[in-house]
């Protein structure tokens, strides 16, 4: 904007990032490089989990949202050491 009074035509709306050359021996921050990489999140899906309370054998129903890989890991935990108890037994 130039002059004593700004006008609408003086406002520049094109704000594209500009390429700036690196100074000698300067390196990009790793966070700048990570911003340029598109990370694809695994698809989340709702899963119904039916299991038994380990103390009183009451049927427990859970709904969880997870990726397919994570729900398989959850299943492995349930088959091994992870035990879920009902609110009454907790």
Swiss-Prot record:
GO biological process terms held by the UniProt record: DNA-templated transcription; symbiont-mediated perturbation of host cell cycle G1/S transition checkpoint; symbiont-mediated suppression of host innate immune response; symbiont-mediated suppression of host type I interferon-mediated signaling pathway
The lineage's top-level taxon is Viruses
Q: Where is the motif (LXCXE motif)?
A: 22-26
Q: Record's Gene Ontology CC terms?
A: host cell cytoplasm; host cell nucleus
Per the record, the domain comment is: The E7 terminal domain is an intrinsically disordered domain, whose flexibility and conformational transitions confer target adaptability to the oncoprotein. It allows adaptation to a variety of protein targets and exposes the PEST degradation sequence that regulates its turnover in the cell.
Tell me the function of this protein.
Plays a role in viral genome replication by driving entry of quiescent cells into the cell cycle. Stimulation of progression from G1 to S phase allows the virus to efficiently use the cellular DNA replicating machinery to achieve viral genome replication. E7 protein has both transforming and trans-activating activities. Induces the disassembly of the E2F1 transcription factor from RB1, with subsequent transcriptional activation of E2F1-regulated S-phase genes. Interferes with host histone deacetylation mediated by HDAC1 and HDAC2, leading to transcription activation.
Task: Indicate which residues form the motif Nuclear export signal.
Answer: 71-79
Q: Which residues cross the membrane?
A: none
Localization: Host cytoplasm; Host nucleus
PTM section of the record: Highly phosphorylated.
Signal peptide boundaries: none
Q: What is the name of the protein in this document?
A: Protein E7
- Keywords, A to Z? Activator, DNA-binding, Early protein, G1/S host cell cycle checkpoint dysregulation by virus, Host cytoplasm, Host nucleus, Host-virus interaction, Inhibition of host innate immune response by virus, Inhibition of host interferon signaling pathway by virus, Interferon antiviral system evasion, Metal-binding, Modulation of host cell cycle by virus, Oncogene, Transcription, Transcription regulation, Viral immunoevasion, Zinc, Zinc-finger
Family listed: Belongs to the papillomaviridae E7 protein family.
Recorded hits in Pfam families, A to Z, give:
E7
Record organism: Human papillomavirus 29
- Zn finger intervals (unnamed): 53-89
Q: How does it assemble?
A: Homodimer. Homooligomer. Interacts with host RB1; this interaction induces dissociation of RB1-E2F1 complex thereby disrupting RB1 activity. Interacts with host EP300; this interaction represses EP300 transcriptional activity. Interacts with protein E2; this interaction inhibits E7 oncogenic activity. Interacts with host TMEM173/STING; this interaction impairs the ability of TMEM173/STING to sense cytosolic DNA and promote the production of type I interferon (IFN-alpha and IFN-beta).
The gene it comes from is E7
* Positions in coiled-coil regions: none
Main localization is host cell
Where is the stretch described as E7 terminal domain? 1-41
One of the entry's Gene Ontology molecular-function terms is: DNA-binding transcription factor activity
């Amino acid at each position: 904007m130039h002059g004593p009074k700004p006008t609408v035509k003086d406002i520049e709306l094109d704000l594209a990032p500009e390429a700036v050359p690196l100074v000698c021996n300067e390196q990009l921050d790793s966070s700048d490089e990570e911003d340029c990489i598109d990370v694809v999140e695994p698809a989340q899906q709702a899963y119904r989990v039916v299991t038994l309370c380990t103390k009183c054998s009451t049927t427990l129903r859970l709904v969880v949202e997870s990726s397919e890989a994570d729900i398989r890991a959850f299943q492995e935990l349930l088959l091994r050491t992870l035990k879920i108890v009902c609110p009454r037994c907790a």
